[in-house]
Amino acid sequence: VEAFVAGVDRGRYRTILGDRAVTAMKARELGRGNIVVGDTVNLTGDVTGAPGTLARVVRVEPRRTVLRRSADDTDPVERVIVANADQLLIVTALADPEPRLRLIDRFLVAAYEADIEPVLCLTKSDLAPPDGLESILAMYKPLGLSYVVLGRPLSHAVLDSLREMLAGQVSVLVGQSGVGKSTLVNALVPDAARTVGTVSPVTGRGRHTSSSVVALPLPPPGGWIIDTPGLRSFGLGHMSAENIVAAFEDLADLTADCPPDCSHLGPECALDKTVPSSAAARLDSLRRLLHSIEGTELGTEPGAMQAESAEDAEDDEPGQS
């Protein structure tokens, strides 16, 4: 029988079969292949879900989409975070903590590479500085992104609009700690009981409150929301430079005048002339990413830097290779 993987914990899988949860383990014949939240699996054995019972996962169905990352930008080994997602909700606070635009760009690259629809979810609008919201929306306007803006307290009207966007979809929440992901999940799934964190007054960063990836069913008309641990980094070392450029959809078409095999990092690159000034920050972000996956930084020699995405060694590591 088919079931949906809603959680993974030390070799045990919480699967949803109809209206019941069934704990399962992976059959030996599946080998070392990993099972992640969002996977559709086939179960055999005791699938009653009764306490103390354990079913077996004997097959993992082909994945429609795969959201992945690497440990850092110099590590080519990919880690699968979630399977079969339809949407990626990029949750970003407009203040407390300050928005990290280059982290948003990394999430966007991962979404486009996985063929997952990205959605900007901008929180704490009540704390936003003047023009803070408008500047972010203007930067990403060329991408035609869907977006939702949330203040505190959360508006019922905005939540209703977000519920319509999530209905019938498998949606993943990503963002750094402290941006309001857990608050949002608790509002959308009343019995979720996700722990709400705070922002450290010393570092200005959020404290981790969710330690694992978990899928939660949305109330009717249904759908799934997948919460992930707060991320301070998001490695893209498994991606080629060509694919990263292609994921910057607002800039990719402007590379037509670049010379063959252009790295987009040197003086011969045509992007310096074709990219409008309004997109200068996006071009800077692209080039920082390209330098990072090469192990270099603007103005440095190869190997002279730690990858930007590995800036926090204590970062939680959702997903598996």
Where are these regions (language model features)?
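Phosphate-binding glycine-rich loops and their immediate beta-loop-alpha structural context
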Residues: 80-84, 91-145
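Short strand-coil-strand connectors
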Residues: 16-18, 219
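Beta-strand/loop nucleic-acid-binding surfaces
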Residues: 21-35
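Canonical P-loop GTPase G-domain recognition
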Residues: 127-179
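Structural detector for short beta-strands of small beta-barrel domains
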Residues: 1-9
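A conserved segment at the C-terminal end of the G1
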Residues: 181-194
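Short aromatic-glycine-enriched beta-strand elements
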Residues: 11-15
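Helix-rich effector regions associated with P-loop NTPase G domains
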Residues: 33-54, 59-81, 85-87, 110, ...
